[in-house]
Amino acid sequence: MYNVFDEYSQKAKNEGYLARSVYKLIEIDKKFSLFSSGNILDIGASPGSFSQYAYANLKNGVLVAVDLNDVNLNFTSNFYFIKGNIYLDEVYQKIKIFSPYSLIVSDAAPSTTGNRLVDTSNSFNLNIRIFELACESLMRGGNLLIKVFQGGEEEQIFYKLKSCFRVVKKVRPKAVRKNSFEIYFLAKDFAKL
């Protein structure tokens, strides 16, 4: 088990972020420049730290956040929250209203069971759905960042990304806990299928 409250948790609290995970996004953005003009989609937004950072970097667009759970974000404009399951068509139709997106970020993870085989399989299925959404709603030249659990069939996702993005990288930010089997796949410069 890991220490729930660590240096990144303290830093997030001090800087007003809702979760420590924001530092994963910050590190990746500083290294790879994720943000450009246009709409942004945050999938698996709760508790909201990715959305906080994305909103602060919003350029001429709207931020759309989607999650099964509520988020406690009080942005004054250019923000829409969709509560629901991304596998449902009614949720997809709401997401589609704001497309195309210049950036889709996802720190989403399935509910974990403690069984790595089950957890990586569920992560794979979730990321396949996010990949499908990205293919349907990213603008040409757009970027995608997804969290992936290692140890399953994640290489299939990586190769799918390589088939429609010009640059695809595996990234493990410093803020990822040492005992975690999560990494991020960063896909830049989407070329429509």
Swiss-Prot record:
Transmembrane segments: none annotated. It is found in: Cytoplasm. One of its GO terms (cellular component) is cytoplasm. It catalyses: uridine(2552) in 23S rRNA + S-adenosyl-L-methionine = 2'-O-methyluridine(2552) in 23S rRNA + S-adenosyl-L-homocysteine + H(+). The keyword Glycoprotein does not apply. GO terms for molecular function: rRNA (uridine-2'-O-)-methyltransferase activity. S-adenosyl-L-methionine binds at residues 48, 50, 67, 85, 107. It comes from the Bacteria. This is Ribosomal RNA large subunit methyltransferase E. It comes from Borrelia duttonii (strain Ly).
